[in-house]
């Protein structure tokens, strides 16, 4: 929403793998659905192909005619692979060992194209607990491909926010900069997100 507000002529390409968002949900949050294209994707290969095609077409346009554009992938962790889907269809009980390499290859290509087109991209992903770690730690799923390609990696955690009647009215979201080329790595901040029309509390913690 902030990107669209700051760029009145801009648009968002939303790659969606979780089937968790709809046009009505977008409009309820005050986002212009006409400036947001939802693209369902099921596999890493499908996402890579669709994203590259859009960027190639975008790069062919004269630079002065390009409108601001934002890519969003929600989420990387839910993307399958062509091999995994074929194995499921054929009832093969084997682990897909190609996923990490496919992710690394996809973002190796996309990072270059995104940079050339000056198109920012937001990727959501899952984390898991590191087993055997001396101190409790979490790691991002999908291998090292996205970790090395990303300019900024933010880990999010949440706790419930209650009012004076002990009713849950929102979440306190804690953000930790695991990687950043723009700010101090390891820095932590917290913000508050209300479930009602108040939304994100921009004054929380000040």
Tell me the role of every PLM-derived stretch:
Residues 7-105:
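Conserved inter-motif catalytic segment of the P-loop NTP-binding fold
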């Amino acid at each position: 929403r902030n990107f669209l507000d700051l760029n009145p002529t801009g648009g968002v390409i939303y790659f969606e793998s979780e089937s968790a968002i709809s046009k009505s949900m977008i409009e309820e949050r005050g986002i212009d659905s006409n400036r947001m294209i939802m693209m369902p994707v099921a596999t890493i290969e499908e996402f890579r192909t669709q994203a590259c095609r859009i960027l190639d077409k975008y790069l062919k346009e004269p630079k002065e005619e390009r409108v601001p554009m934002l890519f969003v992938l929600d989420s990387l962790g839910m993307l399958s692979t062509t091999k995994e889907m074929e194995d499921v269809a054929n009832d093969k009980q084997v682990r897909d060992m190609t996923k990490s390499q496919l992710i690394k290859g996809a973002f190796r290509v996309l990072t270059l194209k995104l940079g050339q087109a000056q198109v920012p991209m937001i990727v959501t992903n899952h984390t898991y607990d590191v087993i055997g770690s001396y101190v409790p730690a979490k790691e991002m799923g999908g291998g090292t491909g996205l970790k090395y390609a990303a300019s900024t990696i933010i880990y999010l955690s949440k706790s419930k926010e209650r009012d004076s009647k002990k009713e849950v009215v929102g979440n306190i979201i804690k953000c930790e900069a695991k990687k950043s080329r723009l700010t101090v790595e390891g820095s932590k901040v917290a913000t508050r997100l209300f479930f009602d029309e108040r939304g994100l509390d921009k004054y929380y913690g000040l």
